[in-house]
Amino acid sequence: MKLLVVGASYRTAPVAALERLTVAPADLSRVLTRLVAQPYVSEAVLVSTCNRVEVYAVVSGFHGGLGDICAVLAESTGCQPAALADHLYVHFDAAAVNHVFRVAVGLDSMVVGEAQILGQLRDAYHWASEAETVGRLLHELMQQALRVGKRAHSETGIDRAGQSVVTAALGLATELLHSDLACRPALVVGAGAMGSLGVATLARLGAGPVSVTNRGVDRAIRLAESYGATAVPIADLTATLSTVDIVVAATAAPEAVLTRAVVTQALAGRNPSRGPLVLLDLAVPRDVEPGVADLPGVQVIDIDRMAALVADGPVAADAAAVEQIVAAEVDTFLTWLRGADVAPTVAALRGRADDVVAAELGRLVHRRPDLTDEQRADVARTVHRVVQRLLHQPTVRVRQLAAEPGGDQYTALLRELFDLEVPQTSAVGTVPDVVVPDVDPQLGGDAEAPPTGGE
């Protein structure tokens, strides 16, 4: 079996395309089930965040697996296959493992080193386990990815390799407002992971008063109390907009929350001498309706703009250390993978030998009914010892060869020579606990919000 990664991210697709590709939490189980129902796909994990949609799969063939995954993505998102292909990247086997580990440590994130993606990978693994679409190989891959991510954050300073997206975007907001954020009134829409980071960062930068609104009132109240902010009802959104200078929008609403009509009405009651109303849209799908950016007196900073903002940011020397960690861990995993691939084949070979021995002993019993039970047992033990000795050295050697780069050819040859049928691995139903590093809002970690991180 082979590992295949098929996905799109902020690197390959604009936010509008990612919006269409995003799989809602309620649809995850259905899409995962559809994936493993395809002829070439036996295991699947689906990662869907603001900045990436990726399928990690175990497939029986590259082209067949790629076709199956693309077909399911097109079907589940309503995207035309041709349009989908424009934004997808594909990684196979060693490159697939390398990509997943780079994602886990934050090297592939909009903000290098952000830790929030670790929690999102853990959630994706959990959802796949619940849907019974994760088996032996993806179980090991996801567990190892989580360990690698934790190791990178504990052994290096990768957390500080880049600014948080919120901090970077608010830095741009200060330029647009021609002043720092101290005492600038602000509103955070959404009380999920990204909303929490927004409130924390605004508080750290001295903005205020800060208001929080959310469809779930209790969550808004709890978040506001944590940072000395004020919770306001979602019904008061328009009125609150007219009193603030900065808005951080980070809900998981399926449609835009800050529509052109809502913002236009808010602008009518706002003093234009305070400068532009700056809207930071951190959500996918977008919280700010596209037409809002055309309104006079409004500046919209969306994910596309933030990606460009942080693309040339400084990368700490710790990133190089993390690259070394990833390279070493990829080698370790590939060695395990090659061994895992040959183990069922060796077991099948020994099983075939046992079947042959049993059949021949059965024939012996029919030919020599005069043998006593003790004699039959002696013959059986002798034959088994001979077979095991004959198989010992070849199976030890094939395990050694299989652990080397390109070793899968020896496993394939063994199957071909003895016409062995190797069953697929069974699914794993539980996700062992793996501690994910806490996200410090002052150091970043807000690059990728889970699709559930809002209302």
Curated annotation (Swiss-Prot):
Question: What SUPFAM superfamilies is this protein classified in?
Answer: Glutamyl tRNA-reductase catalytic, N-terminal domain, Glutamyl tRNA-reductase dimerization domain, NAD(P)-binding Rossmann-fold domains
The residues listed in the UniProt record as binding NADP(+), with positions renumbered to this chain, are G190, A191, G192, A193, M194, G195
Q: In which pathway does it act?
A: Porphyrin-containing compound metabolism; protoporphyrin-IX biosynthesis; 5-aminolevulinate from L-glutamyl-tRNA(Glu): step 1/2
Domain comment as written in the entry: Possesses an unusual extended V-shaped dimeric structure with each monomer consisting of three distinct domains arranged along a curved 'spinal' alpha-helix. The N-terminal catalytic domain specifically recognizes the glutamate moiety of the substrate. The second domain is the NADPH-binding domain, and the third C-terminal domain is responsible for dimerization.
The similarity comment for this entry is: Belongs to the glutamyl-tRNA reductase family.
Q: Which PANTHER family match?
A: GLUTAMYL-TRNA REDUCTASE (PTHR43013:SF1)
The name on file for this protein is Glutamyl-tRNA reductase
Recorded source organism is Salinispora tropica (strain ATCC BAA-916 / DSM 44818 / JCM 13857 / NBRC 105044 / CNB-440)
